[in-house]
């Protein structure tokens, strides 16, 4: 078991990549604190965690709320004694160019994606410094590297996450804290399906996205979770400041 006895916090654990990662981490021996604003989704994830013979806790709230982040980390450490892994998987997208995106939507995308990475890292790092080790895994996107159409807020936010990941890796490497980003391709999750549904005719958009990958298919959340497990575990003990593309060859094609 690659995470036996470890304590992990995963934001965005109510669905998609966050859920798949929580279940895999639990199956590999970690206790997983689940964070999401969707209580029903979290309950389903916790049931899946327990079905995998693991255990976890539920924490309902807004990942862009710094007080919530601080309280959740403090509660987890108080009950479990340490914090080994933080994975910031919560994400949000609104679509639109810089001209058509509403300012409120832009702020919401940055609050969830960038704020949800910064605030949870800010809460977790002091505990990891006290321990002398820890792994932080952030969620970027292949679009932050390649660019993309009609998704300016999301792409800009994911680019900020890559820069934040690198600077945290430099700032805290000497403390034994590793910080890495995963840049997924188009992964078959509820958020991806919602993004297609915004179009008047979703099917051509869906097919174009699928075919953009060298592998000519969408990724599965479980495939991204395997990459996250690698970054969480000692198998990546000399890996920090990297952006790991799990993109079916999107960037190469």
Indicate where each model-derived feature is located.
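Active-site helix of classical SDR
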Residues: 121, 157, 165
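Conserved glycine-rich cofactor-binding loop
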Residues: 7, 14-16
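C-terminal substrate-recognition "lid" of short-chain dehydrogenase/reductases
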Residues: 2, 80, 118-121, 129, ...
């Amino acid at each position: 078991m690659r995470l036996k006895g470890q304590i992990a916090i995963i934001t965005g654990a109510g669905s998609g990549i966050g859920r798949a990662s929580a279940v895999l981490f639990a199956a590999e021996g970690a206790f997983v604190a689940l964070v999401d604003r969707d209580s029903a989704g979290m309950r389903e994830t916790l049931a899946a965690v327990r079905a995998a013979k693991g255990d976890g806790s539920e924490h309902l709230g807004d990942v862009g709320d710094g007080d919530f982040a601080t309280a959740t980390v403090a509660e987890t450490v108080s009950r479990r004694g340490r914090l080994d892994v933080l994975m910031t998987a919560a994400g949000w997208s609104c679509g639109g160019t810089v001209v058509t995106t509403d300012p409120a939507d832009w702020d919401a995308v940055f609050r969830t994606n960038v704020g949800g990475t910064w605030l949870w890292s800010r809460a977790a790092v002091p505990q990891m410094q006290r321990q002398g080790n820890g792994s932080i895994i952030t969620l970027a996107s292949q679009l932050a590297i390649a660019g993309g159409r009609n998704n300016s807020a999301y792409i800009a936010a994911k680019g900020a996450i890559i820069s934040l990941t690198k600077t945290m890796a430099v700032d805290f490497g000497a403390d034994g804290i590793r910080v890495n980003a995963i840049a997924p391709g188009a992964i078959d999750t509820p958020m991806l399906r919602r993004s297609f549904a915004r179009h008047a005719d979703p099917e051509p958009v869906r097919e174009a996205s699928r075919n953009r990958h060298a592998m000519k298919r969408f990724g599965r959340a479980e495939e991204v979770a395997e990459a996250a497990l690698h970054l969480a575990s000692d198998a990546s003990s000399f890996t920090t400041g990297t952006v790991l593309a799990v993109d079916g060859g999107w960037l190469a094609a």
